[in-house]
Amino acid sequence: FQNEDFEVGSLLTAIAGQNGTQKSTLLGIITQTFTLKTEDSMRVEKPLCGGSYISAFKDKFRLSPTFDKPKGHEWTISFDAGMDDFTVESIKRTGDPNVRFWKKGARQEGDGYISFPTIFLSLKRLVPVAEEAKIITDDTLLTQEELNEFKQLHNKILIAQTPISSATTITSKNKQSIGVSTELYDWNQNSMGQDNLGKIILALFSFKRLHDKYPRQYKGGILAIDEMDATMYPASQVELLKVLRKYASKLNLQILFTTHSMSLLKAMDDLVPVSYTHL
């Protein structure tokens, strides 16, 4: 990108385009700007979906030793009110990769990023459970209230009729998600769409926990989802979008995602007048 400007939505932002047009890179450069600093009380918390509220460089970027050089990258994020523009540049570091992204002109520890909880859901979430060598399960991660809400959201979004008897948190080398069991099948037989949805719902619940536990410190958050529509039925993609908008409004989230789905893009377009009415 050279001299490009774009605006993100107050609640939802969809990024679409041909393959190889740096959609995931856009997600990366936005979320890379944010972290939770050492002195932030929310830093000790861990998301239900695994990882942390500090989106990892390795989940977003694989730099080229040929084309990615120090001082070869720069971008600026502007805010609606109360904050100055924040410019990030690439600087040299020892190790591999030999480039890191940091606030332009700043070198002190803690100056490099803005403190704001962020979750980045990469395509690693789509690794099939069947391909994981070791899995740890836990039936106690969610509260009863969260479990009831999860069951309702799962069946609403997937347009499913079979009652869920239990939900099990699944942790492996590559991801942490949640699977469902019914009288007809258990979590071992869940589809990839169910697995993908479970991870996204856990991310939403994670922000809700921050919102409820830290009412004074929590000001909102950022959720980025790469290829959100992957593995999901088109009608379920639309139902998911409605749920995301509801949670974004309730929890002051900015949710950004990449997609190739025409159904999802049409649904986003239909939401625009609704959003203006909401504002």
Residue ranges of predicted features:
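P-loop NTPase switch/coupling surface
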Residues: 1-129, 139-146
